[in-house]
């Protein structure tokens, strides 16, 4: 596997996110101290990536900063807003905020014969993909609850 150092370090946080998801399901609590190191690491990796794009000489350099802006200035505040409005739990919002800092763009991993991710999205903002998938899932659950209420099932 070939990847940039920041993208490899981003893989290292997956067990922490998995543990937090498991703990959220089992105990319904994830300590707030869980998210501080993730956001700190994400900020360092973001600076590392940004330094490589500061020249704005490659076509993707400006796009990188647009994607980071969408992740940090749109996705993270929406996660916070959903939490304040009761649409997300605290751990859900903090996880999405941490993801918006850790993974503002899709990481790329090169293997022998193929590259991940396989599908290239139009927007290219990983945290936006996580947010939209979450909203679709919650919308489906709400719609199912509505149907059960209407039909008495």
Predicted feature locations:
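A membrane-topology feature that recognizes alpha-helical transmembrane segments
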Residues: 1-153
């Amino acid at each position: 596997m070939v990847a940039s150092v920041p993208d490899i370090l981003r893989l290292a946080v997956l067990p922490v996110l998995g543990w937090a998801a498991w703990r959220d399901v089992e105990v319904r609590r994830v300590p707030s101290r869980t998210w501080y190191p993730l956001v700190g690491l994400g900020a360092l990796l973001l600076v590392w990536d940004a330094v490589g794009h500061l020249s704005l000489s490659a076509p993707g350099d400006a796009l990188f900063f647009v994607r980071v802006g969408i992740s940090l200035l749109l996705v993270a505040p929406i996660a916070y807003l959903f939490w304040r409005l009761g649409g997300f739990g605290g751990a859900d919002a903090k996880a999405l905020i941490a993801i918006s800092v850790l993974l503002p763009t899709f990481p790329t991993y090169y293997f022998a014969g193929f590259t991940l991710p396989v599908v290239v999205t139009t927007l290219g903002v990983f945290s936006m993909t996580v947010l939209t998938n979450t909203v679709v899932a919650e919308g489906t659950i709400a719609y199912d609850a509505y149907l059960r209420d209407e039909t008495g099932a």
